[in-house]
């Protein structure tokens, strides 16, 4: 396998259909509840296994993708360390997801790296073990390794499979970078949303507890949300900056996308309760 290129490993985006912050622990981490669903819009990674342990990354965005570079290479190095694998890899990243938008681009790239190389290096680690490695790289990485829509709580690491409606989404991408750390450190952030139980999950009132604060700090996010709310139920994902509106039909979302002001960018994607990475793995 050392010379064979394994192409088209998807690293899908996710949406937080809601994000509720329930409190703050003594160690500073926040207790939260959120609902993750994937969309069929992805980065793509290609891998070529090498006989030496060296790791090399190429991307279509050069230095602009430095954060993702780090996570991809750190993921590969961690897998080498945990598994004792002496092989290496040359990796190509086709970056399509916006950086720092709250849709999980860097975390998803890291997860796909772990899943793909676990297969290509034949290291045979279980999904649970890969998820434990992924958690060292970021709180969202295990969700992408798990590959199923999930209700998450705790600091985001406790996952339960759920099956929300697979809507069509119009995702809008404000041209701002939101610092997750700054949002979670802000004293104005609500931290007292009552917890939902799994039984009341689908009937509960969904919101993003970070949304008002991010909109206040970033007028472009507020403007984008206000525009989208004219057409559909809309929320921010994660700590932003991306916002999404949900539609029953693809054409409805495309029609609204066609009305998008020239200073906004967006995409239409389908919700998916099984990720494209999980589907790719099932085909092997």
From Swiss-Prot:
Keyword annotations for this protein, in alphabetical order, are:
ATP-binding, Isoprene biosynthesis, Kinase, Nucleotide-binding, Transferase
GO MF term list: 4-(cytidine 5'-diphospho)-2-C-methyl-D-erythritol kinase activity; ATP binding
Q: Identify the EC number(s).
A: 2.7.1.148
Report the enzyme's class at the first EC level: transferase
Record field: catalytic activity: 4-CDP-2-C-methyl-D-erythritol + ATP = 4-CDP-2-C-methyl-D-erythritol 2-phosphate + ADP + H(+)
Q: Which NCBIfam families match?
A: ispE
Query: Which SUPFAM superfamilies does the annotation name?
Result: GHMP Kinase, C-terminal domain (SSF55060), Ribosomal protein S5 domain 2-like (SSF54211)
State the name under which the record lists this protein. Answer: 4-diphosphocytidyl-2-C-methyl-D-erythritol kinase
Is ATP-binding one of the keywords UniProt gives this record? Answer: yes
Q: What does this protein do?
A: Catalyzes the phosphorylation of the position 2 hydroxy group of 4-diphosphocytidyl-2C-methyl-D-erythritol.
Entry's family note = Belongs to the GHMP kinase family. IspE subfamily.
Question: Which biological pathway?
Answer: Isoprenoid biosynthesis; isopentenyl diphosphate biosynthesis via DXP pathway; isopentenyl diphosphate from 1-deoxy-D-xylulose 5-phosphate: step 3/6
Coiled-coil stretches? none
Q: Which GO terms describe its biological process?
A: isopentenyl diphosphate biosynthetic process, methylerythritol 4-phosphate pathway; terpenoid biosynthetic process
Name the active site residues.
Answer: 14, 140
Q: Which Gene3D superfamilies match?
A: 3.30.230.10, GHMP kinase, C-terminal domain
| Sequence positions that bind ATP | 98-108
Q: Name one Pfam family in it.
A: GHMP_kinases_C
């Amino acid at each position: 396998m050392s010379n064979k290129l394994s192409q088209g490993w998807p690293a899908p985006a996710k949406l937080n259909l809601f994000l509720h912050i329930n409190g703050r622990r003594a160690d500073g981490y926040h207790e939260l509840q959120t609902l993750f669903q994937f969309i069929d819009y992805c980065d793509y990674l290609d891998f070529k296994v090498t006989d030496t342990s060296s790791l090399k990354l190429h991307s279509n965005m050069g230095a602009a993708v430095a954060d993702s570079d780090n996570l991809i290479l750190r993921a590969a190095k961690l897998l080498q360390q945990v598994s004792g694998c002496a092989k290496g890899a040359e990796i190509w990243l086709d970056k399509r997801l916006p950086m720092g938008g709250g849709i999980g681009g860097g975390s998803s790239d890291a997860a796909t790296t772990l899943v793909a190389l676990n297969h290509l290096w034949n290291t045979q680690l279980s999904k649970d073990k890969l998820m434990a490695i992924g958690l060292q790289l970021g709180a969202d990485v295990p969700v992408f390794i798990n590959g199923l829509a999930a209700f998450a709580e705790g600091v985001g690491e406790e996952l339960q499979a759920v099956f929300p409606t697979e809507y069509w989404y119009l995702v809008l991408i404000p041209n701002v970078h939101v610092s997750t750390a700054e949002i979670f450190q802000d004293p104005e952030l609500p931290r007292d949303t009552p917890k939902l139980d799994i039984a009341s999950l689908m009937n509960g009132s969904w919101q993003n507890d970070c949304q008002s604060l991010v909109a206040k700090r970033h007028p472009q996010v507020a403007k984008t949300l206000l525009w989208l709310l004219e057409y559909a139920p809309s929320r921010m994902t994660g700590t932003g900056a991306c916002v999404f509106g949900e539609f029953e039909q693809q054409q409805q979302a495309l029609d609204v996308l066609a009305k998008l002001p020239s200073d906004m960018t967006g995409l239409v994607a389908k919700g998916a309760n099984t990720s494209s990475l999980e589907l790719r793995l099932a085909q092997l």
